[in-house]
Amino acid sequence: MENSEKLTNSKEVIAYIAERFPKCFTIEGEAKPLKIGIFQDLAERLNEDEKVSKTQLRTALRQYTSSWRYLHGVKAGVNRVDLDGNECGVLEQEHVEHAHKALEESKAKVRARRKEQAVAKAAASKDGEAKTNKNHAKSPKPKNTKPKTSKLNKKPADTSRALTADEVKVGNDVLVNMGSGNMPASIVEFNKDDVRVRLTNGLTMVVKMEHLRS
């Protein structure tokens, strides 16, 4: 049996349907608004396809239509398209306004989260500096003139920073804050606040965007 392995995540499903229906779906650039009822059309076209289930299609469509690049494409005067790229009517103003509102709310959440992270990082840095100065004042003077290496120097400074919204892209390398330190990983899938990453040991996990750093 040729290439019959079942797809495992929404990213793979979106890539697959974009390959099957290139005039309707795209994996990069601005997406086209989809025909109302496109799920039913997809389910019928792929009914005999063992690689993808209806549940996977529904989840992938939800992620696809809530992505920033899809919401950017929902504009006044633009036509919806079916699986074959045929126009299916101009977008209604109500749908355009809804998409614009959803996009702005999503971006506002990212901006607020980045601001909170910056404030928390600044507070932690200030607190750490105060503790360092306090410990330094209590330390006895060395009995010899040989320079003494501070234990703090043994731990490299954290030069990571919070991700910007534009850096949250599939394939980008990031650092995942695991509490005890940052772990290198790469983004394999994202949907608003949740991001699926793959660690260097091959383990995949879903984390919140605030736990990702660059």
UniProtKB/Swiss-Prot annotation:
Pfam families: ProQ (PF04352), ProQ_C (PF17516). Residues 133-154 have a biased composition (Basic residues). SUPFAM superfamilies: FinO-like. GO terms for cellular component: cytosol. Residues 104-163 are annotated as: Disordered. InterPro entries: ProQ, ProQ/FinO, ProQ/FinO_sf, ProQ_C. GO terms for biological process: post-transcriptional regulation of gene expression. GO terms for molecular function: RNA strand annealing activity; RNA strand-exchange activity. It is found in: Cytoplasm. The keyword RNA-binding applies. Keywords: Chaperone, Cytoplasm, RNA-binding. Its main location: cytoplasm. RNA chaperone with significant RNA binding, RNA strand exchange and RNA duplexing activities. NCBIfam families: PRK04950.1 (NF003434). Belongs to the ProQ family. This is RNA chaperone ProQ.
